[in-house]
Every structure is written in C-alpha cells, then in structure tokens.
Swiss-Prot record:
The lineage of its organism: Eukaryota, Viridiplantae, Chlorophyta, core chlorophytes, Chlorophyceae. Core component of nucleosome. Nucleosomes wrap and compact DNA into chromatin, limiting DNA accessibility to the cellular machineries which require DNA as a template. Histones thereby play a central role in transcription regulation, DNA repair, DNA replication and chromosomal stability. DNA accessibility is regulated via a complex set of post-translational modifications of histones, also called histone code, and nucleosome remodeling. This is Histone H2B.4. Residues 1-28 have a biased composition (Basic and acidic residues). Belongs to the histone H2B family. SMART domains: H2B. Monoubiquitinated to form H2BK143ub1; may give a specific tag for epigenetic transcriptional activation. One of its GO terms (molecular function) is structural constituent of chromatin. The nucleosome is a histone octamer containing two molecules each of H2A, H2B, H3 and H4 assembled in one H3-H4 heterotetramer and two H2A-H2B heterodimers. The octamer wraps approximately 147 bp of DNA. Keywords: Chromosome, DNA-binding, Isopeptide bond, Nucleosome core, Nucleus, Ubl conjugation. It comes from Volvox carteri. Pfam families: Histone (PF00125). One of its GO terms (cellular component) is nucleus. Residues 29-40 have a biased composition (Basic residues).
C-alpha cells in the first residue's frame, strides 16, 4: 500500500499535467482500479468464507494429488514385514512413482500417435515400459503387468 500512497501524492500535486495529458492520466487510474478490485476479490473469499474456501481448496488438492503411499507401504510390508519407512522417504518414493508413470504414459501416447491409433492399449503400455525401463527391470515389469492384466480380465 505504500506505493499507492506515493502515487496518490504526485497525482494530487500534479493537477496541471492531468489537464495537459488527460487521456494518459485517465487510463492509468483505470488500470489501477482494475487491479485493486481483483486483489480484494481474491482476498475476500479466503477471509470471508473460510469454510467454503477450505472446501474448494480440498477439492482441488484431491483432484490434483496422486499418492501411492498406501500401496508403497503394503509392498514394503510384503517384502520386509519388520521394516518401516520415514515420511521423507515415502514422499521420495511417491514422486518416483509419479515420474515413472508420467514417462510411461508419455511414451505410450507417442506410440499410439505414431501408429495413428486413437486408443492407448496394453500393447502400447508394454512397449513403452520396455523403452523407458532398463534391462531386467523392464522384463520383470512386463511380466508383472501381463499377470495383472490377465487377472483383471479373468475376474
């Protein structure tokens, strides 16, 4: 707000320049007025209706956040039942899975575009996994993925 008070003082002192250059002087306050209500409207919903603002924020967070924390924990307990994991390590694992998922999805999308097909099928996913993951890791991922798909289709 300090810059606004400084701007107001020169405007009140310089009445004569406004008379000389009315179009420029009139345009500048209009821009300032447009910016000020936008800031106030952004502040008012957060301060005025805290419950509604929180609900909107929660909905946005739920829609955007993809967490695999529960699944990471389940796999950890299957492999090492007596081992725990810190929250920082869990966050790192979650971001790692999100990165791999994004890479595989991007590669599968490219493959479907190369083949001029509108649908990404299990074949594109399998090829994308082979391209993204190295060596033995790709082989294990493909076998586990194939097993999961057959289990899903049979059920």
């Amino acid at each position: 707000m300090a810059p606004k008070t400084k701007e107001e003082k020169p405007a009140s002192e310089a009445v004569e320049p406004k008379a000389e250059a009315k179009p420029k002087a009139e345009k500048a306050p209009k821009k300032k007025e447009k910016k000020a209500p936008a800031k106030k409207s952004a502040k008012e919903p957060a301060a005025g209706d805290a419950a509604e603002g929180d609900k909107k924020k929660k909905k946005a967070k739920v829609a955007k956040s993809e967490t695999y924390k529960l699944y990471i924990y389940k796999v950890l307990k299957q492999v090492h039942p007596d081992t725990g994991i810190s929250s920082k390590a869990m966050s790192i694992m979650n971001s790692f899975i999100n990165d791999i998922f994004e890479k595989v999805a991007t590669e599968a999308s490219k493959l479907s575009r190369y083949n001029k097909k509108p649908t990404v099928t299990s074949r594109e996913i399998q090829t994308a996994v082979r391209l993204v993951l190295p060596g033995e890791l790709a082989k294990h991922a493909v076998s586990e993925g194939t097993k999961a798909v057959t289990k899903f289709t049979s059920a």
